[in-house]
């Protein structure tokens, strides 16, 4: 008896347990343009066939459960079930497979990343038949993309707001991340912005602690950026972290930032949650605020190669939920990030249409149908010697964020900012003149340091600093 006829009410209820693959493994299925497609890295328990493991993932993340239930006869499983439509072994890995699963669009609430993830990466990750499970990629169909607002403003609108074109934007995370008073914190912000940076940033765990309450920080930072704007003639911003213990408190902080007239606020989207993030993104669009996103907690989810969720999926989810910037790794700094894979999800953040490219970890062609793009933020262990590589790798539509690489300058914060701005302008000019940044990068920085004592001092301090560890996030 076929799985389809078993679920028809006219046949009668047949109790018991049957293999998932009888119903949920459908290798002849032709995917629809409206399906959400998922690529899972599956490691079955010994003795579990890969087809059964893939079917179990499809079942437990859609309509299935561990046994046959009589209420199956009250609906059409063929309409609503997830289907494992293909399985392929992972090259070079024993007992690992990529299982491709198609989900009907009707399974998901419109405009809700929360609901999408609750289904696709919910209970199935604790399933006993699987030794490990990792969601490698999702194809979000245009029909579903169109139910999301996405980033509050996007790349072009941000450039127009800031009146800054033709180069990456420069930022700095204020350090020490915890312990400064609000006034001293604001002083550090002012010095960095006056020196030539476009942005400064609250660190991800700066919320509203006893040593510095959020309202005091917002006031002193607003004073700092307005003073720096008046002195430099450039529009400046500070990422005021609105993350809070409740959505109501988060929105209250964003409202106060808007009343101060600052251009941008910030949110920790994984610890804060997708529902809170989408709510804040909607507020930011309605009220003209840019939204910077920090990915605190991402490595808990994405760093293990065989279990969890790859960051490219979290990046796609952020573009849907809403954010104008997101931290994306550096390739060259202290934090995890392999070049081809990093550039793969950077393209998924910025571009409107991205072709399937397995060499960069992109399992599906993704059409964003004009959903605004997100600026990738390179941050973590970078300094002036990295500037040529960062400019070449990330291009103009990016934010290069130097925390210790600004505040660690031997002459202070403002000279540290000057050094970074001079290095960036030198790299952009050299690139525009046709020079090869990858090959001539060090020479370009040395030439610029001859007429910038601030850059020369920075070059001397960080000439021996390297973070040489093998990346774990490989294909």
Swiss-Prot record:
Note describing how the cofactor binds: Binds 1 Mg(2+) ion per subunit.
Residues binding Mg(2+), per UniProt: 201, 203-204
Site entry: Transition state stabilizer: 334
Catalytic residues in the record: 175 (proton acceptor), 294 (proton acceptor)
GO molecular function annotation: magnesium ion binding; monooxygenase activity; ribulose-bisphosphate carboxylase activity
EC number: 4.1.1.39
InterPro entries: RuBisCO, RuBisCo_large_chain_AS, RuBisCO_lsu_C, RuBisCO_lsu_C_sf, RuBisCO_lsu_fd_N, RuBisCO_lsu_N_sf, RuBisCO_lsuI
Binding site residues for substrate: 123, 173, 177, 295, 327, 379
Location within or outside the cell: Plastid, Chloroplast
Catalytic activity: 2 (2R)-3-phosphoglycerate + 2 H(+) = D-ribulose 1,5-bisphosphate + CO2 + H2O; D-ribulose 1,5-bisphosphate + O2 = 2-phosphoglycolate + (2R)-3-phosphoglycerate + 2 H(+)
Propeptide cleavage-removed residue intervals: 1-2
GO terms under cellular component: chloroplast
Record note on modification: The disulfide bond which can form in the large chain dimeric partners within the hexadecamer appears to be associated with oxidative stress and protein turnover.
Stored Pfam families: RuBisCO_large (PF00016), RuBisCO_large_N (PF02788)
Cofactor(s), names only, from the UniProt record: Mg(2+)
Top EC group: lyase
Keyword terms of this UniProt record: Acetylation, Calvin cycle, Carbon dioxide fixation, Chloroplast, Disulfide bond, Lyase, Magnesium, Metal-binding, Methylation, Monooxygenase, Oxidoreductase, Photorespiration, Photosynthesis, Plastid
Modified residues (N6-carboxylysine): 201
Family: Belongs to the RuBisCO large chain family. Type I subfamily.
Function per UniProt: RuBisCO catalyzes two reactions: the carboxylation of D-ribulose 1,5-bisphosphate, the primary event in carbon dioxide fixation, as well as the oxidative fragmentation of the pentose substrate in the photorespiration process. Both reactions occur simultaneously and in competition at the same active site.
Description of how the protein assembles with itself and partners: Heterohexadecamer of 8 large chains and 8 small chains; disulfide-linked. The disulfide link is formed within the large subunit homodimers.
NCBIfam families per record: PRK04208.1
Miscellaneous note of the record: The basic functional RuBisCO is composed of a large chain homodimer in a 'head-to-tail' conformation. In form I RuBisCO this homodimer is arranged in a barrel-like tetramer with the small subunits forming a tetrameric 'cap' on each end of the 'barrel'.
UniProt xrefs under HAMAP family: RuBisCO_L_type1
Protein name: Ribulose bisphosphate carboxylase large chain
Species name: Populus trichocarpa
């Amino acid at each position: 008896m076929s799985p389809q006829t078993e679920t028809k009410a006219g046949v009668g209820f047949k109790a018991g347990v049957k293999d998932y693959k009888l119903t949920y493994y459908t290798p002849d299925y032709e995917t629809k343009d409206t399906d959400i497609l998922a690529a899972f890295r599956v490691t079955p328990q010994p003795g579990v066939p890969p087809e059964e493991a893939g079917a179990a993932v499809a079942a437990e993340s859609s309509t299935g459960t561990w046994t046959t239930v009589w209420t199956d006869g009250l609906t059409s499983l063929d309409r609503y079930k997830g289907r494992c439509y293909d399985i392929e072994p992972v090259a070079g890995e024993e007992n690992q497979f990529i299982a491709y699963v198609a989900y009907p669009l009707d399974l998901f609430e419109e405009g809700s990343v929360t609901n999408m993830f609750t289904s696709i990466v919910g209970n199935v990750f604790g399933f006993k038949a699987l030794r490990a499970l990792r969601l490698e990629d999702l194809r979000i169909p245009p029909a579903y993309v169109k139910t999301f607002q996405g980033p509050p403003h996007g790349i072009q609108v941000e450039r127009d707001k800031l009146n800054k074109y033709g180069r990456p934007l420069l930022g700095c995370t204020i350090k020490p991340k915890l312990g400064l008073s609000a006034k001293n914190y604001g002083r550090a912000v002012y010095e960095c912005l006056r020196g030539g940076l476009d942005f400064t940033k609250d660190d991800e765990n700066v919320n509203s602690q006893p040593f510095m309450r959020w309202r005091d920080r917002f006031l002193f930072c607003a004073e700092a950026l307005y003073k720096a704007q008046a002195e430099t003639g450039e529009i400046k911003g500070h990422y005021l972290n609105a993350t809070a213990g409740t959505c109501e408190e988060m929105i209250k902080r964003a409202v106060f930032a808007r009343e101060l007239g600052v251009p941008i606020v910030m949110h920790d989207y994984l610890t804060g949650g997708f529902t809170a993030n989408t709510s804040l993104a909607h507020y930011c669009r309605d009220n003209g605020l840019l939204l910077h996103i920090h990915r605190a907690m991402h490595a808990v989810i994405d760093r293990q190669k065989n279990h969890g969720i790859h960051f490219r999926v979290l990046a796609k989810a952020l573009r849907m939920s809403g954010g104008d910037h997101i931290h994306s790794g550096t390739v060259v700094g202290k934090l995890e990030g392999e070049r081809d894979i990093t550039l793969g999800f950077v393209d998924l953040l910025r571009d409107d249409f991205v072709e399937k490219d397995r060499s960069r970890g992109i399992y599906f062609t993704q059409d964003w149908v004009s959903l605004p793009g997100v600026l990738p933020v390179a941050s973590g262990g970078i300094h002036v010697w990295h500037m040529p590589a960062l400019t070449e790798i990330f291009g103009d539509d990016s934010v290069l964020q130097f925390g210790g690489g600004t505040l660690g300058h031997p002459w202070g914060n403002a000279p540290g900012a000057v050094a970074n701005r001079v290095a960036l302008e030198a790299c952009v000019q050299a690139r525009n003149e046709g020079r090869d940044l990858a090959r001539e990068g060090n020479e370009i920085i040395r030439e610029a340091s001859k007429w910038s004592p601030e850059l020369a001092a920075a070059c001397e301090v960080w000439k021996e600093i390297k973070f040489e560890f093998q990346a774990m996030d490989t294909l």
